[in-house]
Design a protein with these regions (language model features):
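A generic structural signal for ordered alpha-helices
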Residues: 1-4, 20, 27-28, 32, ...
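Conserved beta-strand-loop-beta-strand hairpin that lines the nucleotide-binding pocket
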Residues: 1-8, 55-175
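STAS-typified acidic loop motif
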Residues: 6-20
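Conserved small-residue-rich
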Residues: 8, 28, 179-180
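Charged, alpha-helix-enriched surfaces in structured cytosolic catalytic cores
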Residues: 17, 44, 129-133
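Conserved short strand/loop->alpha-helix "switch" segment adjacent to the catalytic nucleotide/phosphoryl-transfer site
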Residues: 25-47, 120-127
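Short N-terminal amphipathic alpha-helices
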Residues: 37-43, 54-61
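Conserved polar catalytic motif of the HATPase_c/GHKL fold
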Residues: 48-52
Length: 180
């Protein structure tokens, strides 16, 4: 039976202050549990995912942010598992689902080529990014990203899960990926 350590979970409205606090509270745990190399990779992927939540958080007509975004990090025997969640409109879901499906369909070499293509051929979006975040998360995680969209309140809540191997020699993607 695989053991699991629940490290942190947060659900609500995210902003840079909350993101900074999450990162501060988890950084020490990561360094205590694993090598600096593994901790650095997990920390980087936490930053990227939390930035995605904050930047792409839905705001209602009054400008108030959606109050149900989600971040969870667990440490299992073979891998860290990070889950992000956010509410998206039907229009955003369609584009996001296509983008995620394209990313998941690529192997390591194709992901690197896709990353370079985006880097060389795209400008910045209205949110300040170039569309590299999800591709980079896929490149730096172990195995495929997994995602799911659940209908809720006229839109969709989407979950994104990724795993980071603690020891690549002992990592079994099938064992580590049974999350969502």
């Amino acid at each position: 039976i695989e053991t699991e350590q629940f490290l942190f979970a947060c659900r609500g409205s995210f902003n840079s202050s909350i993101t900074d606090n999450i990162l501060f509270l988890t950084e020490g745990n990561l360094l205590e549990l694993d090598s600096p190399k593994v901790a650095k990779k997990v920390y980087y992927l936490m930053i990227e995912g939390l930035q995605n939540i904050t930047r792409h958080q839905y705001h209602d007509d009054s400008g108030s942010p959606f109050d149900g975004a989600l971040f969870i990090i667990n440490r299992r025997e073979q891998a860290y598992s990070i889950t992000y969640g956010n509410w998206v409109s039907a229009a955003v879901k369609e584009d996001l689902e296509k983008n995620l499906a394209a990313i998941v369909s690529k192997d390591v070499v194709e992901l690197k080529e896709y990353y370079m293509e985006i880097l060389n051929n795209s400008g910045f979006s209205s949110k300040g990014g170039a569309g590299l975040g999800l591709v980079d998360m896929a490149r730096k995680s172990s195995g495929k990203l997994s995602f799911e969209f659940a209908p809720v309140n006229g839109g969709f809540f989407y979950y994104l899960n990724l795993n980071i191997a603690i020891d690549k020699e002992e990592y079994d993607e099938e064992v580590a990926s049974d999350y969502i």
